[in-house]
């Protein structure tokens, strides 16, 4: 049996991210698996707006892990959720806040109905901090801004999927455990998914998908200037939305029609030094070769790749 499991091609059981997003959009529960060198676990996930008592009960009965609510930093801030620990020393840096309960509409708070109601209140745009209390039986997790491109965890992945599906950016997640209490790995997760008619996706595939399709740079400032080296340029400052870093680019107006391309520039002197915008440029000799290459090849753009 072990040899059969080792030879089985589990990649055939993995669904493309587009299918996982479609499952989420239609309110169906799915499974996401993280990397083997990380937690190497699979989580049951459903967009928070579809978390009915039946779905919560399924997670408690079949998932057996901790049922958590993944939310954005903005939502956690609006609900005034304090972090569970002042210093997060957990190995994966999972961002737990204090546990919560709906202020009204619950009894003991632990039933599937009560937890589903608490989740509904926590993601309701009309509700505020006064509508929840702590401690409770729902455990919020705060997703990092930038999602899986910043942290490759189930928290970020579940919020990313909800957002890609055009839904409220929150999700209910629960680790999947085996009958004996051990964590389910991919072979067991495939069996679990087949038994319950679910699709499995991977966080690695989600990261790859976002890298292919997302736009990370936003245009901040543009201005035209004359270069002492020759010609007119248009300088643009871009901001990386993932880490906030700014990058410079300059387009040579006169070579624009010759050949469209990008010449990366990594010297700390910056774009203005390269093009000798500042008089008596002390760095000019260091830029002689890349600058020559820029004009001789007809490249239209020089970018600060620092």
Predicted features by range, described:
Residues 1-250, 256:
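Catalytic domains of riboflavin
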Residues 55, 225, 293-295, 302:
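Short, intrinsically disordered/low-complexity patches at protein termini
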Residues 206, 270, 276-277, 300-301:
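Generic short N-terminal amphipathic or hydrophobic helices
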Residues 278, 290, 298-305:
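Short, intrinsically disordered low-complexity segments enriched in Ser/Thr with adjacent Pro
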Residues 279-284:
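N-terminal helix-forming leader/targeting segments
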């Amino acid at each position: 049996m072990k040899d059969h499991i080792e030879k089985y091609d589990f990649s055939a059981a993995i669904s493309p991210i587009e299918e996982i997003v479609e499952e989420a959009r239609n309110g169906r529960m799915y499974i996401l698996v993280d990397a083997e060198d990380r937690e190497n676990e699979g989580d049951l996930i459903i967009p928070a707006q579809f978390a009915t008592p039946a779905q919560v009960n399924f997670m408690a009965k079949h998932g057996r892990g901790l049922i958590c609510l993944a939310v954005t930093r903005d939502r956690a801030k609006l609900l005034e959720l304090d972090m569970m620990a002042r210093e997060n020393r957990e190995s994966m840096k999972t961002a737990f806040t204090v546990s919560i309960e709906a202020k009204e509409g619950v009894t003991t708070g632990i039933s599937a109905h009560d937890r589903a109601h608490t989740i509904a209140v926590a993601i309701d745009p009309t509700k505020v901090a006064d509508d929840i209390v702590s401690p409770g039986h729902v455990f919020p997790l705060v997703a990092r801004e930038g999602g899986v491109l910043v942290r490759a965890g189930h928290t970020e992945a579940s919020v990313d999927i909800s957002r890609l599906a055009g839904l409220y950016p929150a999700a209910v997640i629960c680790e999947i455990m085996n009958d004996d209490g051990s964590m389910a790995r991919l072979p067991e997760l495939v069996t679990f998914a087949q038994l319950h008619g679910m699709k499995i996706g991977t966080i690695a595939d989600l990261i790859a998908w976002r890298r292919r399709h997302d736009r990370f740079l936003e245009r901040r400032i543009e201005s035209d200037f004359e270069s002492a080296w020759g010609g007119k340029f248009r300088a643009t400052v871009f901001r990386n939305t993932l880490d906030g870093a700014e990058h410079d680019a300059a387009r040579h107006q006169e070579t624009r029609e010759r050949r469209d391309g990008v010449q990366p520039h990594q010297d700390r002197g910056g774009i203005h030094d390269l093009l000798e915008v500042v008089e008596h440029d002390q760095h000019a000799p260091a830029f002689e070769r890349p600058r020559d290459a820029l004009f001789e090849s007809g490249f239209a753009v020089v970018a600060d790749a620092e």
